[in-house]
UniProtKB/Swiss-Prot annotation:
Its main location: cytoplasm. HAMAP family: Rel_fac_1. Gene3D superfamilies: 3.30.160.20, 3.30.70.1660, 6.10.140.1950. The keyword Nuclease does not apply. It holds the Pfam family RF-1. The modification N5-methylglutamine is found at Q237. This is Peptide chain release factor 1. It is found in: Cytoplasm.
Amino acid sequence: MKASLLNKLEILQDRFEELTALLGDAEVISDQTRFRAYSREYAEVEPVYAAYKEWRKVQDDLEGAQALLKDSDPDLREMAVEEVREAKEQLLTLEAQLQRMLLPKDPNDGRNVFLEIRAGTGGDEAAIFSGDLFRMYSRYAEKRGWRLEILSENEGEHGGYKEIIARVEGENVYGKLKFESGAHRVQRVPETESQGRVHTSACTVAVLPEPDEQAAIEINPADLRVDTYRASGAGGQHVNKTDSAIRITHLPTGIVVECQEERSQHKNRARAMSWLSAKLNDMQTSAAQNALASERKLLVGSGDRSERIRTYNYPQGRVTDHRINLTLYSLDDILSGGVDAVIEPLLAEYQADQLAALGD
């Protein structure tokens, strides 16, 4: 094991022993805020400590078995050879486990998200493809047991959406969708194309983690312009009776968010404010993420909205993710919600990238 990793594990062991003592301290027990904080940290550290303790035990066993290889008794030497082999296999498994455990956790992985899909180049065809992407993510959300609600939609003239914004709620939503941000390109023959020529269109996808109250940016009400208007689209007759839709403009940045799907103006405002907070958070963190990506030459995860990340080629039934040079000939399955076929290799590549940086 690398010396840098061993050093991290030694520090973690010291912290585990410190936490054990703190959680038995009467003063800490009487302070519920500190006790809860230390308990959470203990729960995170304890599995790593247990794996490291096991690694040290196997390391000792290996050294003992290696010493027996020099014994004069041939039976003992034969037994030691097998013990050395088993110990080395166990050490490799434990080292890989410890490396994964030491990977930095993304605090946003467990958060819900705001999913933004916008038609780019390609006019009507781009809007239709936005609808295809939205259906793909909707089916994926359904498969994972997530809840998806549309906040705002601007339908295309010939189907699909010029823009559609949704909130996705569930377990590990951002952790799964965070690498979907970027430009998605489609190559296919439009229905209106009489010559059978393949056209190329594009849409942009943005996945923003929904901040909790602690992480939310404090927004000065004086920086906001709030407009109400009558909702259009889904909702039946009710939508034309009240000005329930909300449009909020953040004056310092020019960011505009709209929510029109709830019948209650209060609910629409709450959703819009949460979405605005997510967009402001994203502005704040994206610069730092881009700097990190360029510094470490990250293969995936830059989150650049203009970066072409994926191509969907209909004539060939092909999906290519350009960040990891992954090509799959299962377009229909992926568009039907089987996005894990692309997401899982991306996550594996990102984890490998983190592991490579861990020992630096």
